[in-house]
Amino acid sequence: MTDNYCFTSLRINSKPKWISGRGCPTFYSKFSNYSADYVNKLYNMVRRQSNAPFFCFTDDSDGIDSNINVVEIDVSQYLYWNNWWPAWCKILLYNRKELDQFYKKIFFDLDTIIHGDITPIIEHDDNFSLVYSKWRGLPYKMQNPHKSMYNSSCIVWKNNKPIYDYWMKNPRGYVERYMGTDDFYHTEKIKRTAL
């Protein structure tokens, strides 16, 4: 089954209309300024190692390479939520029909730089895995015991519909309670393994 996989990325350029709670508008705009060039570069880095289909879920497809499977998504319903930011859209990928045909999905953040062999990621066979943030180290963990040591800059999953369904029970509440998907997975005790 390792040959039935795809790569995904997410580009959201819509910015929240109402910003409060964090006190720093740049916190939000930082995640909304990735140009199509980021998508194209990530695609080319992946393409050097795999010919698997590559999807970009986006609200702005201008300038994206025509070889990429672009899927337009609408995030307008979230733009007025307190503490919403584009990283939350990663959870929406778990319920996308476009990905159902693939046994395994591999997601990379757009600012990911691939400079090594990704075969171990492609061959990773757990149901849901995130990057384990070894670089944060023990001092970080000791100072932030409530924070996750996992990072969603790379996600490998087979079927995360149960996570999507769980999130949909109270999406606005989770968005207002957590700093993003990493804290959501950690605090809500979503079962995951390390990449």
Give residue ranges: language-model regions.
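N-terminal anchoring/stem segment of glycosyltransferases
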Residues: 1-80, 99-101
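Short, solvent-exposed loop/turn segments at secondary-structure junctions
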Residues: 12-15, 60-63, 75-78, 112-114, ...
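Soluble or luminal CAZymes and related metallo-dependent hydrolases
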Residues: 34-41, 86-89, 176-181
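Residues that flank catalytic or metal-binding motifs in active/ligand-binding sites
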Residues: 50, 90, 108, 150-153, ...
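GT-A fold catalytic core of metal-dependent nucleotide-sugar glycosyltransferases
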Residues: 70-72, 86-138, 157
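A short, glycine-/small-residue-rich helix N-cap motif at loop->alpha-helix starts
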Residues: 77-89
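Short, P/G- and charge-enriched loop/turn segments at secondary-structure junctions
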Residues: 80-81, 139-145
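Catalytic core and acceptor-binding pocket of nucleotide-sugar-dependent glycosyltransferases
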Residues: 152-195
